[in-house]
């Protein structure tokens, strides 16, 4: 065939970028031809499938294609039919997706390589999930391109050419298996391009929200650490200020005490010589004080002689002598009565002790009087028992 000699681009590595940006993978031309021949044979055998046209279209991608439309696809022989109206276009897109999935399934079955298995598992026929590369700020301008374009975009072939053995296997496949696989992929849920664009925008917004949440959480953590550090610094500053205040107060108290000591020393420095001489002046001072007391006593006892008053010294002398004799007699009587008074006081103390003992005895007697009725009752009961015993013995 002429198309087998075309140089194909090697497949891209199996990463998130290749899976999320291109929602579907184009088939090689040889596989297209084999698929068209198989479908034509099935359409000739069954009249119900004669109206279906075999074509492999590509789902709309969120990015611009690196290859222009119609440049190399016209040479490869792929049939891209523009849409007449919206209903026929959506039907053709769905048919193309299902057949492309079936072709990918056949390719995986014939090849069995782990890379194709991984790519077929990562790519879904109806939807595409945006990757971190697609959600990057540099790709936002390309993501804003409308998904509902008039014609589907084409991409370069991502699979190597098939061997003649695999082509023969595909051509010799039964029509029943093809119909079952097509029905299985047709029964799956389809996603419209508008919903795909909404999902893509939603993922972008969700990624931005997560980024802002991470930024806010990191700022909150830094602010919390900064707050803790500032609080610690404020606490240590407050502690230092408190210690400085205590130190200043202690210094002020010490200064005030030193000032008072200085004042006391100044006062005592003037009085210390006089205090040292006090031992010599003490006897003279006591004698002068005794003379002063006697003079004051004499002045208080003497009567003033005013208004021509006179005193009979003889009569006063006689009266003073009589008073002194009476005082002496009173003193003698008191001396005589002192032993008697002592005896009387001793007897009074003994009487007080006896009176206290009598009070105790009276209290004991009251208690014994209270117990007399009990004893009498016991005595009567004992007598009754004795009488009963004597009667029983008889």
Curated annotation (Swiss-Prot):
UniProt xrefs under Pfam families: QWRF
Biased composition (Polar residues): 85-96, 111-120, 142-157
Comp. bias regions, Low complexity: 14-67
Coiled-coil intervals, chain numbering: none
Basic and acidic residues compositional bias, start-end: 97-110
Region (Disordered), start-end ranges: 1-171
Domain of life: Eukaryota
Position of sequence motif QWRF motif: 211-214
Family: Belongs to the QWRF family.
Protein name stated in the entry: QWRF motif-containing protein 7
Species assigned in the record: Arabidopsis thaliana
């Amino acid at each position: 065939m002429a198309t087998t000699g075309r140089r194909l681009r090697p497949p891209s590595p199996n990463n998130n970028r290749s899976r999320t940006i291109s929602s579907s993978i184009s088939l090689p031309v040889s596989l297209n031809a084999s698929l068209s021949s198989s479908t034509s044979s099935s359409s000739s055998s069954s009249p119900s499938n004669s109206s279906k046209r075999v074509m492999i279209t590509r789902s709309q991608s969120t990015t611009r294609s690196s290859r222009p439309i119609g440049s190399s696809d016209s040479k490869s022989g792929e049939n891209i039919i523009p849409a007449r109206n919206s209903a026929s276009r959506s039907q053709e897109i769905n048919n193309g997706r299902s057949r492309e999935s079936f072709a990918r399934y056949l390719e995986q079955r014939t090849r069995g390589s782990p890379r194709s298995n991984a790519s077929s598992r990562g790519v879904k026929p109806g939807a595409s999930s945006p990757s971190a590369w697609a959600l990057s700020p540099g790709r936002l301008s390309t993501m804003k391109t409308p998904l509902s374009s008039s014609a589907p975009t084409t991409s370069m072939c991502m699979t190597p050419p098939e061997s003649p053995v695999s082509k023969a296997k595909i051509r010799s496949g039964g029509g029943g298996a093809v119909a079952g696989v097509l029905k299985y992929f047709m029964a799956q849920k389809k996603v419209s391009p508008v919903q795909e664009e909404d999902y893509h925008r939603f993922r972008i917004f969700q990624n931005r929200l997560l980024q802002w949440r991470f930024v806010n959480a990191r700022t909150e953590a830094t602010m919390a650490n900064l707050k803790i550090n500032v609080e610690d610094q404020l606490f240590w500053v407050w502690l230092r200020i408190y210690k400085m205040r205590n130190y200043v107060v202690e210094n002020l108290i010490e200064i005030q005490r030193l000032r008072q000591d200085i004042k006391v020393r100044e006062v005592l420095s003037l009085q210390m010589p006089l205090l040292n001489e006090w031992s010599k002046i003490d006897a003279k001072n006591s004698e002068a004080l005794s003379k002063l007391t006697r003079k004051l006593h004499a002045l208080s006892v003497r009567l003033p002689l005013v208004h021509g008053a006179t005193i009979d010294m003889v009569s006063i002398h006689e009266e003073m002598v009589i008073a002194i004799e009476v005082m002496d007699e009173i003193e003698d009587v008191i001396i005589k009565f002192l032993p008697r008074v002592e005896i009387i006081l001793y007897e009074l103390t003994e009487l007080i002790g006896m009176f206290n003992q009598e009070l105790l005895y009276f209290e004991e007697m009251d208690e014994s009087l209270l117990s007399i009725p009990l004893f009498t009752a016991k005595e009567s009961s004992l007598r009754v028992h004795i009488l009963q015993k004597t009667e029983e013995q008889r």
